[in-house]
A protein has these predicted regions:
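Short, cysteine-centered beta-strand-loop-beta hairpins and adjacent loop/turn segments enriched
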Residues: 68-69, 93-104
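Residue-level signal for well-ordered, solvent-exposed loop/turn and beta-edge residues enriched
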Residues: 41, 103, 119-121
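Short beta-strand edge/turn micro-motifs at domain boundaries
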Residues: 108-144
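Short, low-complexity N-terminal intrinsically disordered segments enriched in polar/charged residues
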Residues: 1-38, 143-165
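Hydrophobic alpha-helical core bundles mediating ligand binding, dimerization, or RNAP-core interactions
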Residues: 17-20, 24, 36, 60, ...
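Short, surface-exposed coil-to-beta transition loops
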Residues: 71-73, 105-111
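A short hydrophobic beta-strand element
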Residues: 83-93
Length: 165
């Protein structure tokens, strides 16, 4: 898919998404971070916000692989107006947490990327992460705590102002 951003820069969003997924799968944080602007932000559904290329690279190389291995990430049906890119995804990994006992767990979601000059300025997602948490074998109380944190984060977003009044 090709998109033209407001500055007239032509972007191959299919190539961007392919490299995005591939860099995570091969544990290449530096390549992943290069897809972002210098001041880019990645909002992870589990770990929170990572700001700047160095922190984003550390997220992939350290945080993601601390308790998981053998990542698989695929993006489908991208839609973009040149400023925002949406894509449905499937994501799985082999969890190394004791509760998971080496099981492959996964979930799906939608990636939302704000773009600037052909790079990702901000990444966030709407993820069915509770599916993966249950597959890991987390206790219901632990899942509830994680979901409560995500709910609080969502309600701080400006789009929620009208719903929170």
């Amino acid at each position: 898919m090709i998109a033209v951003n407001p500055g007239g820069i032509i972007m191959d969003t299919t190539a961007l998404l392919k490299e995005f997924c591939s860099a995570v799968e091969r544990r290449d944080g530096k390549a992943f971070a290069r897809l972002f602007t210098e001041d880019g932000v990645y909002h992870d559904v589990f770990y929170g916000a990572f700001e700047g290329r160095q922190k984003i690279a550390e997220m992939v190389d350290d945080w993601f692989h601390r308790t998981a291995r053998d990542f698989r990430w695929e993006m489908f049906r991208p839609v973009s107006d040149g400023k925002t890119l949406y894509a449905y995804y499937t994501f799985s990994y082999v969890s190394t947490l004791p509760e998971a006992k080496g099981k492959r767990v996964g979930f799906d979601g939608v990636s939302i990327m704000n773009l600037r000059d052909g790079k990702i300025a901000e990444y966030r997602e709407v993820a069915n992460a509770s599916l993966g948490l249950l597959e890991i074998g987390f206790a219901p109380e632990r899942v509830a705590k994680i979901l409560a944190k995500e709910s609080a984060h969502l309600k701080k977003r400006p789009e929620w102002a009208r719903h929170s009044a």
